[in-house]
Amino acid sequence: METPITYFDELNPERNTLDRETIHQLRKGTKHLRAHLHLFRQLEGQQEETENLRTAVKKLARMLSVQRDADVLYSLLQNMISEADDAELVALMTELKQKLQDKRLPPSELKHVLGLTRDIKKKTHKLLGKEPAENDIKPILKLRLSELCENGEGILSSEITDWEELHDWCKQIKKLMYQHKMIRNQTPAELKIIEILDSLGDELGKINDQKILENFLQQQQLLCTRAYTHQLYQKLYSLISDYRQQHLCTCRNLLLNLMQLK
Protein backbone atom coordinates (compact mmCIF):
# COMPACT_ATOMS: atom_id res chain seq x y z
CA MET A 1 0.00 0.00 0.00
CA GLU A 2 1.32 3.43 -0.92
CA THR A 3 1.62 5.69 2.11
CA PRO A 4 2.15 9.46 2.48
CA ILE A 5 5.54 8.94 4.09
CA THR A 6 7.09 7.69 0.83
CA TYR A 7 6.97 11.24 -0.55
CA PHE A 8 9.07 12.58 2.34
CA ASP A 9 11.64 9.77 2.59
CA GLU A 10 13.95 10.93 -0.21
CA LEU A 11 14.36 14.51 0.99
CA ASN A 12 18.02 15.15 1.80
CA PRO A 13 18.22 17.24 5.01
CA GLU A 14 21.66 18.56 3.96
CA ARG A 15 20.52 20.17 0.71
CA ASN A 16 20.35 23.96 0.36
CA THR A 17 17.78 24.16 -2.43
CA LEU A 18 14.67 22.35 -3.61
CA ASP A 19 14.38 21.42 -7.28
CA ARG A 20 11.10 21.19 -9.16
CA GLU A 21 10.74 17.41 -8.73
CA THR A 22 11.36 17.57 -4.96
CA ILE A 23 8.78 20.34 -4.59
CA HIS A 24 6.35 18.23 -6.63
CA GLN A 25 6.92 15.17 -4.43
CA LEU A 26 6.53 17.13 -1.20
CA ARG A 27 3.31 18.71 -2.47
CA LYS A 28 1.96 15.27 -3.38
CA GLY A 29 2.93 14.10 0.09
CA THR A 30 0.98 16.91 1.75
CA LYS A 31 -2.12 16.14 -0.35
CA HIS A 32 -1.89 12.42 0.36
CA LEU A 33 -1.45 12.98 4.08
CA ARG A 34 -4.31 15.50 4.30
CA ALA A 35 -6.57 12.95 2.58
CA HIS A 36 -5.65 10.39 5.24
CA LEU A 37 -6.26 12.86 8.05
CA HIS A 38 -9.62 13.87 6.61
CA LEU A 39 -10.74 10.23 6.61
CA PHE A 40 -9.51 9.76 10.18
CA ARG A 41 -11.56 12.77 11.22
CA GLN A 42 -14.68 11.27 9.61
CA LEU A 43 -14.17 7.97 11.42
CA GLU A 44 -12.89 9.14 14.81
CA GLY A 45 -13.94 12.77 15.12
CA GLN A 46 -11.45 15.54 15.84
CA GLN A 47 -8.39 14.28 17.73
CA GLU A 48 -5.69 16.62 19.00
CA GLU A 49 -2.87 14.54 17.53
CA THR A 50 -4.29 14.42 14.01
CA GLU A 51 -5.46 18.05 14.09
CA ASN A 52 -1.97 19.27 15.04
CA LEU A 53 -0.48 17.23 12.21
CA ARG A 54 -3.11 18.54 9.80
CA THR A 55 -2.21 22.14 10.74
CA ALA A 56 1.50 21.45 10.16
CA VAL A 57 0.81 19.87 6.77
CA LYS A 58 -1.32 22.83 5.64
CA LYS A 59 1.47 25.19 6.70
CA LEU A 60 4.04 23.22 4.69
CA ALA A 61 1.78 23.24 1.62
CA ARG A 62 1.42 27.03 1.84
CA MET A 63 5.17 27.52 2.16
CA LEU A 64 5.81 25.43 -0.94
CA SER A 65 3.02 26.93 -3.05
CA VAL A 66 4.83 30.06 -4.34
CA GLN A 67 7.85 28.15 -5.65
CA ARG A 68 5.62 25.34 -6.92
CA ASP A 69 3.47 27.79 -8.90
CA ALA A 70 6.55 29.49 -10.35
CA ASP A 71 8.01 26.13 -11.40
CA VAL A 72 4.74 25.05 -13.03
CA LEU A 73 4.29 28.35 -14.89
CA TYR A 74 7.89 28.17 -16.10
CA SER A 75 7.23 24.67 -17.45
CA LEU A 76 3.93 25.72 -19.08
CA LEU A 77 5.60 28.64 -20.86
CA GLN A 78 8.45 26.37 -21.95
CA ASN A 79 5.98 23.92 -23.50
CA MET A 80 4.10 26.73 -25.23
CA ILE A 81 7.37 28.11 -26.61
CA SER A 82 8.27 24.70 -28.06
CA GLU A 83 4.92 24.55 -29.91
CA ALA A 84 4.73 28.20 -31.07
CA ASP A 85 5.78 29.34 -34.54
CA ASP A 86 5.27 33.08 -33.99
CA ALA A 87 8.72 34.60 -33.32
CA GLU A 88 7.35 37.66 -31.48
CA LEU A 89 5.12 35.49 -29.31
CA VAL A 90 8.09 33.26 -28.49
CA ALA A 91 10.14 36.34 -27.54
CA LEU A 92 7.39 37.54 -25.17
CA MET A 93 7.02 34.13 -23.53
CA THR A 94 10.79 33.83 -23.14
CA GLU A 95 10.87 37.22 -21.40
CA LEU A 96 8.01 36.18 -19.11
CA LYS A 97 9.74 32.88 -18.34
CA GLN A 98 12.85 34.69 -17.13
CA LYS A 99 10.79 36.62 -14.58
CA LEU A 100 9.85 33.33 -12.90
CA GLN A 101 13.41 32.16 -12.28
CA ASP A 102 13.88 34.33 -9.19
CA LYS A 103 10.90 32.89 -7.31
CA ARG A 104 12.88 30.42 -5.16
CA LEU A 105 12.59 29.70 -1.47
CA PRO A 106 15.04 31.90 0.47
CA PRO A 107 17.52 30.00 2.72
CA SER A 108 15.65 31.04 5.89
CA GLU A 109 12.39 29.51 4.61
CA LEU A 110 14.15 26.45 3.23
CA LYS A 111 15.52 25.69 6.70
CA HIS A 112 12.00 26.00 8.11
CA VAL A 113 10.61 23.70 5.37
CA LEU A 114 13.21 21.01 6.12
CA GLY A 115 12.52 21.20 9.87
CA LEU A 116 8.77 21.07 9.36
CA THR A 117 9.13 18.13 6.97
CA ARG A 118 11.17 16.13 9.50
CA ASP A 119 8.56 16.79 12.19
CA ILE A 120 5.69 15.77 9.89
CA LYS A 121 7.54 12.61 8.87
CA LYS A 122 8.07 11.55 12.49
CA LYS A 123 4.43 12.17 13.44
CA THR A 124 3.18 10.42 10.30
CA HIS A 125 5.08 7.24 11.19
CA LYS A 126 3.12 7.15 14.46
CA LEU A 127 -0.16 7.82 12.66
CA LEU A 128 0.33 5.00 10.15
CA GLY A 129 0.51 2.53 13.03
CA LYS A 130 -3.25 2.85 13.55
CA GLU A 131 -4.79 2.64 10.09
CA PRO A 132 -8.61 2.31 10.10
CA ALA A 133 -10.27 -0.96 9.09
CA GLU A 134 -11.11 -1.34 5.41
CA ASN A 135 -14.69 -2.30 6.25
CA ASP A 136 -15.03 1.17 7.81
CA ILE A 137 -13.35 2.92 4.88
CA LYS A 138 -15.16 1.41 1.89
CA PRO A 139 -18.73 2.61 2.61
CA ILE A 140 -17.46 6.18 3.07
CA LEU A 141 -15.50 6.06 -0.20
CA LYS A 142 -18.43 4.58 -2.13
CA LEU A 143 -20.75 7.36 -0.96
CA ARG A 144 -18.14 10.04 -1.63
CA LEU A 145 -17.50 8.72 -5.13
CA SER A 146 -21.20 8.91 -5.94
CA GLU A 147 -21.40 12.48 -4.61
CA LEU A 148 -18.35 13.64 -6.57
CA CYS A 149 -19.64 12.08 -9.81
CA GLU A 150 -22.95 13.88 -9.34
CA ASN A 151 -21.20 17.18 -8.59
CA GLY A 152 -18.88 16.76 -11.55
CA GLU A 153 -21.74 16.04 -13.92
CA GLY A 154 -23.32 19.35 -12.93
CA ILE A 155 -20.06 21.29 -13.22
CA LEU A 156 -18.91 19.85 -16.57
CA SER A 157 -22.30 19.65 -18.30
CA SER A 158 -22.25 23.33 -19.29
CA GLU A 159 -19.78 26.14 -19.94
CA ILE A 160 -17.48 26.68 -16.95
CA THR A 161 -17.99 30.07 -15.34
CA ASP A 162 -16.95 29.36 -11.74
CA TRP A 163 -13.32 28.26 -11.92
CA GLU A 164 -13.01 28.16 -8.12
CA GLU A 165 -15.81 25.58 -8.04
CA LEU A 166 -13.93 23.49 -10.60
CA HIS A 167 -10.70 23.80 -8.59
CA ASP A 168 -12.48 22.73 -5.40
CA TRP A 169 -13.86 19.69 -7.22
CA CYS A 170 -10.32 18.93 -8.40
CA LYS A 171 -9.07 18.94 -4.79
CA GLN A 172 -11.88 16.60 -3.75
CA ILE A 173 -11.09 14.25 -6.65
CA LYS A 174 -7.42 14.05 -5.64
CA LYS A 175 -8.36 13.56 -2.00
CA LEU A 176 -10.64 10.64 -2.89
CA MET A 177 -7.92 9.10 -5.06
CA TYR A 178 -5.46 9.11 -2.17
CA GLN A 179 -8.10 7.75 0.20
CA HIS A 180 -8.74 4.82 -2.15
CA LYS A 181 -5.03 4.01 -1.90
CA MET A 182 -5.58 3.29 1.80
CA ILE A 183 -7.33 0.05 0.77
CA ARG A 184 -4.71 -2.68 1.08
CA ASN A 185 -6.19 -5.43 -1.11
CA GLN A 186 -7.64 -3.45 -3.98
CA THR A 187 -10.02 -5.15 -6.40
CA PRO A 188 -9.65 -4.64 -10.18
CA ALA A 189 -12.60 -2.20 -10.02
CA GLU A 190 -10.95 -0.23 -7.19
CA LEU A 191 -7.67 -0.09 -9.11
CA LYS A 192 -9.55 1.25 -12.12
CA ILE A 193 -11.25 3.88 -9.95
CA ILE A 194 -7.84 4.99 -8.65
CA GLU A 195 -6.48 5.16 -12.21
CA ILE A 196 -9.38 7.30 -13.46
CA LEU A 197 -9.37 9.56 -10.39
CA ASP A 198 -5.62 10.07 -10.84
CA SER A 199 -6.02 10.99 -14.53
CA LEU A 200 -9.01 13.22 -13.82
CA GLY A 201 -7.16 15.02 -11.03
CA ASP A 202 -4.17 15.51 -13.33
CA GLU A 203 -6.31 17.04 -16.10
CA LEU A 204 -8.16 19.30 -13.66
CA GLY A 205 -4.83 20.32 -12.13
CA LYS A 206 -3.57 21.40 -15.55
CA ILE A 207 -6.67 23.55 -16.00
CA ASN A 208 -6.03 25.24 -12.65
CA ASP A 209 -2.38 25.80 -13.59
CA GLN A 210 -3.53 27.51 -16.78
CA LYS A 211 -5.76 29.81 -14.72
CA ILE A 212 -2.74 30.67 -12.55
CA LEU A 213 -0.78 31.39 -15.73
CA GLU A 214 -3.57 33.66 -16.97
CA ASN A 215 -3.48 35.60 -13.68
CA PHE A 216 0.31 35.98 -13.99
CA LEU A 217 -0.05 37.22 -17.58
CA GLN A 218 -2.71 39.74 -16.56
CA GLN A 219 -0.38 41.13 -13.88
CA GLN A 220 2.45 41.45 -16.39
CA GLN A 221 0.18 42.98 -19.03
CA LEU A 222 -0.66 45.83 -16.67
CA LEU A 223 3.00 46.86 -16.87
CA CYS A 224 2.90 47.15 -20.68
CA THR A 225 2.41 50.40 -22.55
CA ARG A 226 2.75 49.24 -26.18
CA ALA A 227 -0.52 48.44 -27.94
CA TYR A 228 1.14 45.74 -30.04
CA THR A 229 2.35 43.92 -26.95
CA HIS A 230 -1.23 43.87 -25.68
CA GLN A 231 -2.20 42.14 -28.93
CA LEU A 232 0.44 39.48 -28.25
CA TYR A 233 -1.03 38.92 -24.80
CA GLN A 234 -4.43 38.36 -26.40
CA LYS A 235 -2.87 35.66 -28.57
CA LEU A 236 -1.49 34.02 -25.43
CA TYR A 237 -4.91 34.05 -23.77
CA SER A 238 -6.38 32.45 -26.89
CA LEU A 239 -3.76 29.69 -26.83
CA ILE A 240 -4.45 28.97 -23.17
CA SER A 241 -8.18 28.85 -23.84
CA ASP A 242 -7.64 26.27 -26.59
CA TYR A 243 -5.53 24.09 -24.28
CA ARG A 244 -8.13 24.40 -21.53
CA GLN A 245 -10.94 23.23 -23.80
CA GLN A 246 -8.89 20.16 -24.73
CA HIS A 247 -8.40 19.32 -21.05
CA LEU A 248 -12.10 19.87 -20.29
CA CYS A 249 -13.04 17.48 -23.10
CA THR A 250 -10.75 14.84 -21.60
CA CYS A 251 -12.26 15.46 -18.15
CA ARG A 252 -15.78 14.86 -19.46
CA ASN A 253 -14.76 11.55 -21.01
CA LEU A 254 -12.99 10.44 -17.82
CA LEU A 255 -16.03 11.33 -15.73
CA LEU A 256 -18.25 9.19 -17.97
CA ASN A 257 -15.89 6.25 -17.41
CA LEU A 258 -15.85 6.88 -13.67
CA MET A 259 -19.64 7.00 -13.42
CA GLN A 260 -19.82 3.48 -14.83
CA LEU A 261 -17.80 2.23 -11.83
CA LYS A 262 -19.46 4.05 -8.94
Residue ranges and their predicted role:
Residues 1-262:
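Function-determining surface determinants
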